[in-house]
Amino acid sequence: LETAAESYRVFRFGEDVSRCDVAARYLGGTLEGSRFELSFRTGERFTLEWALTGRHQARNAAAAAALAVAIGIPPETIAAGVVHARLPGMRSKVTRLDGVTYVNDAYNANPGSMRAALANLAEFADPARLVLVLGEMRELGGSEAAEHRALVENALQTFPGVRLLTVGRAFGECPGALRFDRSEEVVETLAKLVRDGDLVFAKGSRGIAVELALPEAAR
């Protein structure tokens, strides 16, 4: 890739500013926001807070900042603007209903985004108060079964005692999880399962519409 790019003007982003034009160092977060340090090869450095959560979103900030640098926007302007980023619907949407916090991240999913979501939740979620509603990931071809097994294993290992509900036939029979074929089938079980103070996180591929497992006000 480096060889192929030799004839082009290349801007790099990542976590180490000594190797990149722009770097973002994640400083931790909560359900509704996070902090990160945005650094530029030219020496500017900013500690920022924004409404997005997760290490993966800090990397996205670095990518956006690198593009801005490429078109000539000054670092100070980039830093002032990036903190106003907001996600569209069904992407980490937080709703609190009757003492329960619902996170609707149901717009889409793939193995990488599922891993990122679980890693983010692990920063602050109490496994004993966590309910995961995970919809199947589509268009995985021959790796479908293995990826869904790995997702369930990751969830159960990361959050001992978690209440795990899977939606979609791609999951197959997964010990430790309640299995449903369709998102609408989850509603009644979820209503009986949640308790005051719980955190419910829902994510899956767009085709499984896992938001339909949540109360209507949280969709």
Regions found by a protein language model. Give the residues of each.
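Acidic, Mg2+-coordinating active-site environments of NTP-dependent enzymes
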Residues: 1-101, 126-128, 153-163, 169-176
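Short amphipathic alpha-helical segments
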Residues: 2-6, 115-116, 145-146, 176-178, ...
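A short, gly/pro- and small-residue-rich
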Residues: 9-14, 213-219
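Short amphipathic alpha-helix with an adjacent loop that forms part of the alpha/beta core around
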Residues: 187-195
